[in-house]
Regions:
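Alpha-helical transmembrane segments and their helix-helix packing motifs
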Residues: 1-262
């Protein structure tokens, strides 16, 4: 936590969650849009590192191992997010929800925050994806690696896509909770690097990250997914992320805090 307590109690983490949630919910729309846009840019920088490293490693080993190695690089995106204080749509399944639950924010403000953050995240992704697709900006092997990431998303049936999205929502919301609990930037950086690998290693279906993967592949012509299919995959990711984040983390933390406070 911000006071440097390395052994913060759940009630302390919840108190900080609610305070931060109230602050986020009262920001002006342009502030929400700006932090969301930067969050999208941060994710794409991490994905750029992933596809470049994966493409390079794929020239000397099998694609599966290349993907695992490349996934190690994605954590830098979450480092940018948590240290630079940009925001991702899935970060807001705990903090502002806690404020609304505690009576210190409205559902309307929460809906506004979710929609603006997600939209600006996606705009940030699209900007960088368009640049990466320009011939010569990154090696062709990197674009091919993006195509493989998109193929993983494309090949999942609905049950697998939803299940993967639920886990992604759980992981990101748990990341938010633990990041509030730790007392130093160094610990947050280490946590971000670990969570980044946990997201990319199994190619979890994350509404922002997966959309970025599909956009790079679509803009560069390394996938045959069309607009309708990409949109359906995105909606599936959003639904699963919400279920995992709200249902498995936020709800259980509320029960935990209420139980321990008597």
């Amino acid at each position: 936590m911000s006071n440097g307590d390395q052994h913060a109690q759940p009630q302390d983490i919840w108190r900080e969650t609610v305070n931060e949630g109230e602050r986020r919910l009262t920001r002006e729309p342009r502030g929400l849009a700006a932090t969301g846009l930067v969050g999208g840019l941060d994710v794409m920088l991490g994905l750029t590192a992933v596809i470049v490293l994966t493409g390079a490693v794929a020239t000397i080993t099998n694609p599966e191992l290349a993907h695992v190695v490349g996934s190690l690089a994605f954590g830098i995106a979450l480092v940018f997010v948590v240290i630079g204080r940009s925001e991702l749509f899935t970060e807001n399944f705990l903090v502002p929800v806690g404020a609304v639950y505690s009576g210190r924010g409205s559902r309307t403000a929460l809906a506004r925050m979710w929609s603006l953050t997600l939209l600006s995240n996606l705009v940030g992704l699209a900007i960088v994806a368009a640049i990466l697709s320009i011939d010569g900006v990154v090696p062709q092997g990197a674009l091919d690696a993006a195509g493989e990431l998109a193929k993983t998303i494309e090949d999942r049936n609905l049950a697998a896509a939803l299940g993967s999205a639920v886990i992604a929502g759980l992981v990101m919301t748990l990341f938010t909770w633990v990041a509030l609990a730790v007392g130093s930037d160094g610990a947050r950086i280490a946590l971000a690097l670990l969570i980044g690998f946990l997201l990319l290693g199994p190619s979890l279906n994350h509404a922002v990250v997966s959309f970025g993967e599909m956009l790079i592949a679509a803009f560069s012509g390394t996938t045959d997914m069309g607009v309708a299919e990409i949109a359906f995959k995105e909606v599936t990711a959003i639904v699963g992320n919400l279920a995992g984040g709200l249902g498995f983390v936020t709800a259980t933390r509320v029960v935990q805090v209420r139980g321990e406070s008597g």
